[in-house]
Regions:
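A short beta-loop-alpha structural element at the N-terminal edge
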Residues: 3-19
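Conserved active-site alpha-helix within GNAT-family acetyltransferase domains
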Residues: 99, 114-116, 120-141
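Hydrophobic alpha-helical core bundles mediating ligand binding, dimerization, or RNAP-core interactions
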Residues: 17-25, 37-42
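Conserved acetyl-CoA-binding loop-helix of GNAT-fold acetyltransferases
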Residues: 88, 94-107
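Helix-loop element at the rim of GNAT/NAT acetyltransferase active sites that forms part
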Residues: 19-32, 74
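A short helix-loop-beta-strand connector motif used in the catalytic cores of GNAT acetyltransferases and
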Residues: 43-54, 82
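Conserved acetyl-CoA binding element of GNAT-fold acetyltransferases
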Residues: 78-90
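Conserved beta-strand in the GNAT
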Residues: 54, 61-70, 87
Length: 143
């Protein structure tokens, strides 16, 4: 059985995270982040505005990631989180990594609730990962 490590990502693994993040953006048809985007991301990570989590295989390769952005919520009157940036390399899918990564992120971040907004095609996947409480519609304000 392969040995996997689940951890909070920091500056030491930022380059690996950037590579995985580029693959994620390409997979969903979005533009790759610019260097300025990545600089802002690193700053946000260092200030813990966003927490990135990863799964590393026994060879040290980052094979999956997700993020939790903590915020205060009156839904629970405690710290809640917004779940994003979820990506597992295709060769590592269907091995239970996704479930374990989500569980690790929830436990380590200490959030009292975790929400996710997703495309219609991803709803069943997120339900299978434990996102089962419907909260109505999620809309973004156009700026």
């Amino acid at each position: 059985m392969e040995q996997l490590q689940f951890l909070r990502l920091d500056r030491a693994r930022f380059d690996a995270l950037c590579g995985l993040h580029r693959a994620y953006k390409e997979a969903i048809g979005e533009d790759a982040p610019t260097q300025a985007d990545l600089d802002r991301l690193l700053g946000a990570m260092e200030r813990e505005k966003i927490l990135f989590y990863g799964c590393v295989d026994e060879g040290g390769q980052l094979v999956g990631c997700c993020s939790v952005s903590p915020t205060f919520s009156t839904y629970t009157y405690a710290t809640a989180g917004v779940f994003e940036d979820f990506y597992i390399l295709p060769a590592f899918r269907h091995r239970g990594i996704a479930r374990r990564l989500v569980s690790f992120a929830v436990e380590d971040s200490g959030v009292s609730s975790l929400t996710v907004g997703c495309a219609d095609c991803d709803v069943e996947m997120y339900k299978a990962l434990g996102f089962t409480v419907p909260l109505g519609n999620l809309l973004a304000f156009e700026l």
